[in-house]
Every structure is written in C-alpha cells, then in structure tokens.
Amino acid sequence: MLNKTILILLTLSLSLMGFEYKLEPKKVSENVWCFFGKLEMPTKENGGDMSNHCYVKAKSSYILIDSGPTYKYAQAAYKEMSKIHNLPVSYVINTHEHDDHWLGNNFYKEQFNAKLLGVELQDKNYKEGQKTRMHKLLTKDAINGTKIVKLDTHIKENKIITLDGEKFEFVPVGQGHSQFDVFIYMPDKKVLFSGDLVMNGRITSNREGLVLGQLKALKIIKQYNFDVLIPGHGFDVSKNAMNESIQYFSLLKKRILEAVEEDTGLDGVTKFVKMIEFKDKKMFDLLNTPNVYRAYSELEFYEEE
C-alpha cells in the first residue's frame, strides 16, 4: 500500500502541471478538514473552484463529502491531504447532482477504487461519456481527465451507517436546492455537512429548487445537535451558519405571497420583491432576480396549510 501511495503522489506531481489549483485544507473539527471554494460562479480563471468539500479521517482511510469540480482539482486536494495523513480514500459521498460537487469522483475511483455514494438522479441525468457545464466553461487544461462515472450506491432513505469506524447519518430531504438533496450528519463528532441546502456569504441559485422545499429542509437541519455545519458554499461553519439561508427563504416566501396578494403578476414581481437585506452578498445582482421569478411561479397558487 505504501509503494502504491508513493506512485500515486509521483503521478500527481507530473499531472498537476498546467492549470494550477492553489488549495489549502482548513481543519474544522477533530479529523475533519475542508476545502472552501470561492464565492463566485465557475470560470476559466477559478477552474470551477467555487464549492466546498471535506475529508474525514477514519480508522484507516479518508472518507469524503463531495469531491470538487474536476479530476485535476481532486488530484490537488488529495496531494495536500496526503501531507497531513498518507491514507487512501475509501468512500466519496455526494450531496446532490450539481457537477461542481462531484466531478472529482473519477480521480478517487481510478486511484483508490473508492466507493461512490449519492442520489439516483445524478446517474439518471449524467451519463458516462457526456459533457457537463464544467466541460463547457473551463479550459481544456483544467478539465482534462475529468469523466462522469456511475455511483456505486444510491442514497434513497434516512439511514445511519458506519464506514471505516466512523458513523454517518444520511438524511434525504427531496427537492430543496436541487431536485433531490441529501445532508450528512456525524453524531459522534456533531458535524453536519449540508450540501447546498445551506450557503452563506453569497446568494443561492434556486434554479432547480423550491422555496418550500428549502424551508422544510432547513427546519429538519435545525433539529440536529451540531457544533459545526459545513455549507455547500460559504465560509461560516459555526452554529449560526444556516441563519442567512433561513432568513433569505423565509423573507422570500413572505414577500412573494404579499406580491401575489397585490396581484403584481410575474412581470411586476421584481419591483415589489427586492430582498435588499442581501444586496451586499456575493452574486446578489446575478442570482436574486431569477430566484424571485422562480419563487413567484412556485407560490402563485399556494395556499397556507
């Protein structure tokens, strides 16, 4: 195993030429390190480095929550983590189907035959051999080697499972940020990985999500006893990490329903619903207006239960 790991590291050193990811793992809890992406859209300049993913040191291996946007990104992340503990990767758990979170999977599958876990829609919507938005947005140098690989296991129901001595709870919540989201909780460490159900420091993109689904998911997350919460995007990992998301979706629901009552119509809703409390957050100008339009379409005929 040692010789194989040395060979992998030598291969990494050679293959990381060209586009360079400058990654630095941050320790967030005992035996948990995360890589935090930029609060930007994916671009040629950032190589898709705009989401968070984490390494958990288990008994004899690393277990990952998401894997990043490219093969080369995953290489760079593993190279940094091998400096902390020289361990293989045994499992990669994906939180949802958006490609900035899982296109690093094939690095871990090829190098370690890691078991890949995630939502069924990921396999249904992305087939081997296809190109995703990252293939279209990023430079060839950054995306080189990145391939879609099938998951080994689909997460369909709430379950607690022990992987290499570490206990994880998988909590599927249905359509929240994406068409089907899962968050992961480590009860022994009191660490929760929310995926994109929680973001902070930036505005979320709700292009495939639901306001009601987000609020439902956030209510479930709030019931868990966590000391650390890792958002899908953002740097706040404290007990207050989800406050921005709760405020945003609560206000969005309230104001959209007021707009419906005022009969603004879809064309006039953005003049009525401005969400100015969030105007200083990253990507507000880019994402807030589409979120308002989508929320109006969702809630136009909503009746409070």
Enumerate the language-model features and the residues they cover:
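Metallo-beta-lactamase
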Residues: 61-63, 67-71, 160, 167, ...
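Active-site HxH/HxHxD metal-binding segment of metal-dependent hydrolases
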Residues: 79-156, 160
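Accessory terminal helices/loops
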Residues: 13, 223-225, 236-305
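Sec-dependent N-terminal signal peptides
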Residues: 5-14
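Acidic/histidine-rich helix-loop elements
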Residues: 36-50, 135, 142, 201-210
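Conserved beta-strand hairpin/beta-sheet module of binuclear metal-dependent hydrolase folds
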Residues: 30-80, 184-194
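Divalent metal-coordination and catalytic microenvironments
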Residues: 31, 56, 66, 81, ...
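Boundary at the C-terminal end of the N-terminal hydrophobic targeting segment
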Residues: 16-20
